[in-house]
């Protein structure tokens, strides 16, 4: 369907079940995350100029409200907010299929990095590829994500670790925003690892990023957020504090890769620094859980990465019961998780991480939006929010966990436009 103005006006009628996930901030804990605010049908949603103007019972829709709208009949269908993938490494060069086989043979993620694989391997490929090559690859991934109901994607740099390539990655994200339907949230992550030019000198590398790369990222308006890999043997607390403080002073939001490999106090530091989110958290401590539960920092969990690494999953049930706000992200990247599968995220979260399907929906909608600071505009179906929705092939949201491993999306709606239909 062409992206003409009238296509941003949409009337979705005869909805069997409408899941609104209403709210404008992260939902913390079992009770809040379990409340997804369903309306049993017949229900309806009206979108005008890309913004939701009505969401409720179809009987309450006046004819004047839908004048000039395209109609979409959702008889026998469940409608939910568009999914928000709040953690991806979308733009990268090359693949690492051989490393996956090494992992299957028993090599650890850290041992592969020590052999010159891991992030360093992708860094070399990303430095070598052109912007057009990187853009074409990222565009394919976005198209696949759109088919699974994703309407907003966080996209990190971090495979350059020098000025030229970090800017190149972020320009690709900027350009893709205008060349495909999904909304992108750009994150500068030069501190993904220490660049080979600074091997053994991580503090000097952080200073290079703060003094030479970050100012140029900000000057060119290429990022909204800054991320860092806080981990034993990568970047310590003081290096993290230096990087993220500089980013905040430059006007960026901040987030962290935290407590992925070993308990390292990353969650506590993320809460202290006011991060939008602390991500991974496979090895979070009880003190870290308490710190996140008492803060506004979202705990973004990445089940597909744990699955790919054959690692223990993050303690989602324990975190939610303690009062944390949990989001789910794919962690799409060419190494530890070459997948952006929403069906796999739902299956792992509910079958192996102890989350209810309602909590998983919250984690992929309003809490995912909060993890990128956009819960005021996306993540729920209510007047004033963007018209981002998913129409399932089934009448109930419960099929998202029940019919596992399958893409159940019939339509993806972005800003009032039907951008994908499963034909």
From Swiss-Prot:
Q: Write the record's keywords in alphabetical order, separated by commas.
A: Cytoplasm, Histidine metabolism, Hydrolase, Iron, Metal-binding, Zinc
The record lists the catalysed reaction(s) as: 4-imidazolone-5-propanoate + H2O = N-formimidoyl-L-glutamate
* GO molecular function terms noted in the UniProt entry: imidazolonepropionase activity; iron ion binding; zinc ion binding
EC assignment: 3.5.2.7
Q: Which Pfam families match?
A: Amidohydro_1
Residues annotated as binding Zn(2+) are 87, 89, 257, 331
Q: Which NCBIfam families match?
A: hutI
Q: What is this protein called?
A: Imidazolonepropionase
**Gene source species:** Porphyromonas gingivalis (strain ATCC 33277 / DSM 20709 / CIP 103683 / JCM 12257 / NCTC 11834 / 2561)
């Amino acid at each position: 369907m062409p992206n003409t103005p009238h296509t941003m006006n949409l009337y979705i009628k005869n909805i069997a079940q409408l899941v609104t996930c209403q709210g404008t901030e992260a939902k913390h804990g079992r009770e809040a995350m379990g409340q997804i605010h369903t309306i049993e049908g017949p229900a309806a949603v009206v979108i005008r100029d890309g913004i939701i103007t009505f969401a409720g019972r179809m009987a309450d829709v006046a004819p004047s409200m839908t004048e000039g709208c395209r109609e979409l009949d959702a008889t026998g269908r469940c409608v939910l907010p568009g999914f928000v993938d709040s953690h991806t490494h979308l733009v990268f060069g090359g693949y690492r299929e051989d490393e996956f086989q090494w992992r299957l043979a028993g090599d650890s993620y850290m041992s592969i990095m020590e052999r010159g694989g891991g992030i360093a391997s992708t860094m070399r490929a990303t430095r070598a590829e052109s912007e057009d090559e990187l853009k074409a690859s990222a565009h394919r991934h976005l198209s696949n994500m759109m088919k699974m109901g994703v309407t907003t994607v966080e996209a990190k740099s971090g495979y350059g670790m020098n000025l030229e390539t970090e800017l190149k990655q972020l320009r690709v994200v900027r350009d893709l925003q205008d060349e495909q339907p999904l909304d992108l949230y750009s994150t500068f992550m030069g501190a993904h690892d220490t660049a080979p030019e600074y091997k053994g000198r991580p503090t000097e590398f952080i200073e290079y990023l703060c003094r030479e790369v970050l100012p140029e990222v900000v000057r060119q308006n290429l990022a909204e957020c800054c991320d860092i890999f806080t981990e034993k043997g990568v970047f310590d607390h003081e290096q993290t504090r230096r990087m993220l403080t500089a980013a905040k002073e430059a006007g960026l939001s901040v987030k962290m890769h935290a407590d992925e490999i070993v308990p390292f106090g990353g969650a506590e530091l993320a809460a202290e620094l006011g991060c939008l989110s602390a991500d991974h958290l496979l090895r979070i401590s009880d003190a870290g859980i308490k710190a996140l539960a008492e803060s506004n920092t979202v705990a973004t969990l990445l089940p597909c990465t744990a699955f790919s690494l054959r690692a223990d999953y993050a303690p989602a049930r324990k975190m939610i019961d303690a009062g944390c706000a949990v989001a789910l992200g794919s962690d799409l990247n060419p190494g530890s998780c070459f997948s952006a599968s929403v069906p796999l995220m739902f299956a792992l979260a509910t079958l192996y991480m102890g989350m209810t399907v309602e909590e998983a929906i919250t984690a992929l909608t309003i809490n995912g939006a909060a993890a990128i600071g956009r819960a005021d505009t996306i993540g729920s179906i209510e007047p004033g929010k963007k018209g981002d929705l998913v129409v399932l092939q089934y009448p109930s949201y419960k099929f998202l966990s029940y019919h596992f491993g399958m893409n159940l999306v019939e339509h993806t709606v972005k800003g009032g436009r039907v951008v994908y239909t499963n034909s």
